[in-house]
Structure formats: C-alpha cells, structure tokens
C-alpha cells in the first residue's frame, strides 16, 4: 500500500502544521502547509532562542554538524532526485548541495583567522578584530536551483554561527521541506534552522519588517521585492544581502557577520 507523504513546516526543531490549518497545492496533488504570520513569528522566536547556544558552540563542532548534514543528504540522494523531478540534472543538483555543505563545513574553523585581524595602531594598545554572528537571518530561497540554491544560502549563515528562518519557493517548496527532514536528523539543535512554506506575498513583508530579524538574504527575490524589502528593513537597519543563488565564497560567510574591534591597553 502506498502511503502518501505529509509535508509540514519545520519550526523550533519540530514538524508542525500551520496554525491556521490552511494548505495549498503548488505541485500536483501534494498538499503543502500554508504558513501564516503567526507561524513566521514562532519561527523567528525559535531562531532567537537558539542563537545563544548555536553561536557559543566551537567552530569545530559547527563544522561537524554541517558535515553530518552532508552525510544525511547524500544518504537520501534518491529521494531528492525524485523530488527534484528525476534525471541527470537532478542528480547533479543533489551532488552540488552535498558539496556546498562539505565546503562550508571546512570553513567553520578557518573563519576567525581569515576574517579576523591584528591591527597596527599608534599608541600603547593591542588592537584586534574578530568576526561575530549577525544574529537571526531571514532567507528567501531561490526558485532555481531549488535544492542547491537553498543549501548555498543556509550553509554560510550557519557556518558563522547565525540562526535562520527560511521561506521556501512558493511554486516549488518540496525540496526545501524535505531538506528540513535531513537537518532534523543531523545533530542540528532545534530552532537553528526553521523552514516555512506559503504565499510569499503574505510572509515576505512580515519577515522583512520583523524587528527581531537582523539580516535577510534576497537571492530568491525579484527586483520589485528587493526594493520593498530594503524599505521595510530600514526600520531596524536590517542587513540586506544580495548574492547569486549559485555563488559560493567566504565573502558569503562574512556577509552575515559583524566585525568587532577591541582596543586593549598595554604597558600600563
């Protein structure tokens, strides 16, 4: 007997239905939960609660967890190929997603040395700069590539110690919702990644204007949506990150980080 899969939102480490009970059908006969403003609020609250513990973990431990996520994703390769539509292109996309997780896992314990610095200053001071996480990051996932593009947005934010709230593509949400199942079994603490599905016109304005979101990645947005996000983000000086969905770079990690400079007197 075939058992039809039930897709749910992923909030605070738990798989939940939308509080409104609504659903929509973006891909054939599959029902997808239609997230609401309250679901978004709960996701941001969960991300904020998880931020302290996740950012306090050692860089090596964060790298181990990202690598574990890559292992779990690779182990479910056939499922993701099916969700993506099948064929060689889908197989290559899954491989790209695995490679992205492994690549960013390797950067976790190198970030402080590469992005940080000891600064020469005039005077009896020891001056140094260290990177710190921005905080809660909102991610608007790109339509294509649905899986690899999403992983390339999540991984750099997690690498730097941030927590994230993801809006999966409205018309192609299944890869993102299935990725949440991988993350739930990858030793990732609850609330570090929260995945929402639903109508973008309902969720995006609240994500952009939420005062407890510190940055937002707009890789999956149209130019018109980016303009409205930038306007809404100005209220709490929210960082707006614009990078291509297929891009992988250490600069993507630092885009979600604050550089803290410390002055320490010496010779006193």
Task: Outline where the language-model segments fall.
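Conserved phosphate-coordination/catalytic loops
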Residues: 34, 95, 198
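Alpha-helical scaffold segments in soluble metabolic enzymes
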Residues: 46, 68, 83, 100-103, ...
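Pocket-edge structural micro-motifs
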Residues: 11-13, 19, 105, 141, ...
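Rossmann-like NAD(P) dinucleotide-binding subdomain of oxidoreductase/dehydrogenase enzymes
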Residues: 110-268
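Short, structured beta/alpha segment
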Residues: 1-85, 241, 249, 258-268
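N-terminal Rossmann NAD(P)-binding subdomain characteristic of aldehyde/semialdehyde dehydrogenases
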Residues: 54-154
């Amino acid at each position: 007997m075939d058992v039809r899969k039930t897709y749910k939102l992923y909030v605070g480490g738990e798989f939940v239905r939308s509080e409104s009970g609504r659903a929509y059908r973006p891909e054939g006969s599959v029902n997808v939960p239609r997230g609401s403003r309250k679901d978004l609020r709960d996701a941001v609250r969960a991300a904020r609660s998880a931020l302290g513990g996740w950012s306090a973990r050692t860089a090596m431990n964060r790298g181990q967890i990202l690598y574990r996520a890559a292992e779990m994703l690779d182990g479910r390769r056939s499922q993701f190929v099916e969700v993506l539509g099948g064929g060689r292109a889908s197989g290559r996309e899954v491989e790209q997603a695995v490679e992205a997780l492994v690549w960013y896992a390797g950067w976790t314990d190198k970030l402080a040395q590469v992005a940080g610095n000891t600064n020469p200053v005039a005077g009896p001071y020891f001056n140094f700069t260290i990177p710190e996480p921005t905080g809660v990051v909102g991610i608007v996932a790109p339509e294509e590539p649905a899986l690899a593009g999403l992983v390339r947005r999540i991984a750099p934010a997690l690498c730097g110690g941030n927590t994230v709230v993801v809006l999966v593509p409205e018309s192609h949400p299944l890869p993102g919702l299935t990725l949440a199942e991988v993350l739930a079994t990858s030793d990732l603490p609850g609330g570090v990644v929260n995945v929402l599905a639903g109508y973008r016109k309902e969720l995006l304005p609240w994500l952009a204007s939420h005062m407890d979101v510190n940055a937002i990645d707009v890789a999956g947005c149209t130019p018109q949506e980016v303009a409205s996000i930038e306007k809404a983000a100005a209220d709490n000086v929210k960082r707006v990150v614009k990078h291509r969905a297929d891009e992988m770079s250490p600069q993507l990690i630092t885009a979600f980080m604050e550089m803290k400079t410390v002055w320490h007197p010496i010779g006193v």
